[in-house]
């Protein structure tokens, strides 16, 4: 049994943290889960050829606003050469209206909605050893044998500290940006943004975060981009991380954060003023 996790990134230097998290969470089935990353700038035929050569028994693909059109067209073509292989979609672009997505995209068998780690693990168990049924797996919307759609509902949000560290092997990320997550969710309710739908904001244990940041520092990773929606929404969390990377600066690694300017406090500005130029980058929406 071979389950393929496929990601179509915007550029080669990007990496897809989500699929690496899924593979890490299903570590007990590591030999059955294969990961492939592509870009939306590649020829579709080259991607189709690579996927076909993998001989997958199941294909799972990650969907975002920047790749959804490309992915839909790709999977429609892939269905012609892999007519009997189950195709699953996941990610924010398909989670919130999964039934409509499946209605418009007959190439797909189902959608993993919401957070994928636990759902993907159960999906792997279903296909590998049959220990879990689709019917009992929360977080799935899928086509039944008669073509009707089955919606199992969303599963409860998980403890972010239980997500395994995805970067034990850095060889796959040479000359690429490392993405890191210390929180999930967003405190705001912007009507144009999918992030606002998930109202529960959760943080990874700060001691675990420091341990993982030290791993990047020890390996002199050029850049680490935090994917936290609003990094400085919890001041003690942000200050603890900024203080740690200042105190353990290796002179090489740069850290990138998305923050809200109106939440910045004086003590945060004072700390930033003592940092090495280039140690941090701040991305601020206006």
Which residues fall in each region the model found?
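N-terminal [4Fe-4S]-dependent radical SAM core
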Residues: 1-3, 137, 141-182
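Glycine-rich beta-alpha loop elements in corrinoid/cobalamin-binding modules
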Residues: 2, 18, 25, 29, ...
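Nucleotide-activated donor-dependent transferases that construct or modify glycoconjugates
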Residues: 2-11
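Conserved beta-strand positions
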Residues: 5, 61, 89, 113, ...
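Tryptophan-centric aromatic hotspots in well-structured domains and transmembrane helices
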Residues: 12, 66, 96, 101, ...
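Short N-terminal binding/cap micro-motifs at the start of the first secondary-structure element
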Residues: 12-18
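Generic structural signal for well-ordered alpha-helices
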Residues: 19-23, 51, 72-76, 124, ...
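Radical SAM [4Fe-4S] cluster-binding motif and immediate context
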Residues: 161-286
């Amino acid at each position: 049994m071979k389950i393929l996790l496929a990601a179509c990134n915007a550029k080669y230097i990007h990496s897809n943290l989500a699929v690496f998290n899924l593979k890490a969470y299903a570590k007990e089935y590591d030999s059955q889960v294969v990961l492939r990353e592509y870009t939306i700038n590649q020829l579709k035929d080259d991607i189709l050829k690579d996927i076909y050569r993998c001989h997958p028994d199941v294909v799972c693909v990650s969907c975002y606003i920047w790749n959804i059109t490309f992915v839909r067209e790709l999977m429609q073509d892939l269905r012609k050469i892999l007519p009997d292989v189950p195709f699953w979609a996941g990610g924010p672009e398909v989670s919130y209206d999964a039934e409509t997505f499946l209605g418009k995209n007959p190439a797909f068998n189902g959608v993993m909605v919401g957070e994928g780690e636990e759902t993907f693990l159960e999906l792997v168990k279903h296909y590998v050893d049959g220990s879990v049924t689709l019917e009992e797996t929360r977080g799935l919307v899928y086509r039944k044998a008669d073509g009707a759609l089955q919606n199992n509902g969303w599963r409860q949000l998980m403890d972010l500290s239980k997500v395994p560290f995805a970067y034990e092997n850095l060889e796959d990320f040479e000359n690429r940006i490392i993405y890191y997550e210390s929180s999930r969710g967003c405190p705001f309710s912007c009507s144009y943004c999918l992030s606002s739908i998930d109202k529960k904001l959760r943080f990874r244990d700060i001691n675990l975060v420091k341990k993982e940041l030290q791993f990047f520092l020890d390996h002199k990773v050029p850049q680490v981009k935090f994917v936290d929606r609003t990094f400085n929404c919890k001041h003690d969390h942000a200050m603890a991380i900024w203080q740690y990377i200042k105190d353990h600066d290796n002179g090489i690694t740069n850290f990138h954060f998305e923050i809200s300017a109106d939440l910045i406090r004086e003590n945060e500005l004072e700390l930033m003023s003592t940092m090495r130029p280039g140690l941090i980058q701040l991305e601020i929406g206006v």
